Every structure is written in C-alpha cells, then in structure tokens.
Amino acid sequence: MTTPEIRGVYPGSFDPPTIAHVAIAEAAVRAGALDRLDLAISRIAFGKDTARQAPAEVRGALVERLAATRPWLHVVVTDAQLIAEIAAGYDVVVMGADKWAQVRDPAWYDSVEQRDAALATLARVLVVPRPGFDVAGADVLDVPAHLAGVSSSAARAGRTELIAPECRPER
C-alpha cells in the first residue's frame, strides 16, 4: 500500500521569483514533510496592481526554471484569486504573515461567518513571520531573518541580486 502524496501550495505573484521565495519553498517542504509543492500564480492577483505586473504566463515560465532543478516543485497558473479557493484540495498552504493577516481580516469578507467558513476550509497553514504581523493560528516557518527585506518590488526596481539565480536576466 502506498502512502498518499502530501501536497502543498504556495500562492504568489512571483514577479519575479526571489531568493526569499526559494528559501520559503524549501522551508515549507521541510516543515510540512511535503512530497510536492505547487507555486500557484493567479492570472489576476487579488489586491495587486496588475498594470505593472508581468503576464501570468511570463511569470509561470520564470518559475518553471526553479522547478526544473527541484523535482518536488511544480507550477500552476490559476484563475482563482482567494487563498481558500487556491488551497482547495491541498494538505498545506504557505503564505507570508501579511497575507495571513489579510485572510483572517473580516473586512475582506461579507461577514465574520463567511470569513470563518473560508478559514475552516484551509488545511495546515505555514506562515512566514514578518515584523508587525500576528501569526496566531498558523505554524511558523523557519526562514533566515536576513531574507525578510527581500521583495519582488525591489528586484523589479533593479536589485537583481534578489532574483532567484535561475531567473536572473542574462547579462
């Protein structure tokens, strides 16, 4: 009898994928004992300015470069925008503490009951801590503190050393 595969999902814009995204993915695989981690890219990212965002297919192609060297890593492009929708069917969902705060904030729902119902659909939640954000109700990932300041925004602004090595522009 084979053991069922333990699958996780890490939703994000990955525009571009950074060294922090890689470290988070690796920490999630370890902490969640995952056999597979899907990086889920929404065609239209919820709450993000899409005017300056690379198309989902371009972002997906970059993330595929990461997956090419990591057999446990896969890429999915989705029309879903809400974490609860993206995480449906997975054993683990990975997110930053800022996103976890948003997921738990009733202001994003029609009612507290709707929020509670959405939270109840989530399986295990692995959260990357960030200063100023509460991580109650989730398991905290151990990610090196020096990566806290890494962002895709900074990478797009010219800090190419923050981009995952496989995804850096050729010089």
Q: What is the meaning of each model-derived region?
A:
Residues 1-171:
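Nucleotidyltransferase catalytic core that binds NTPs
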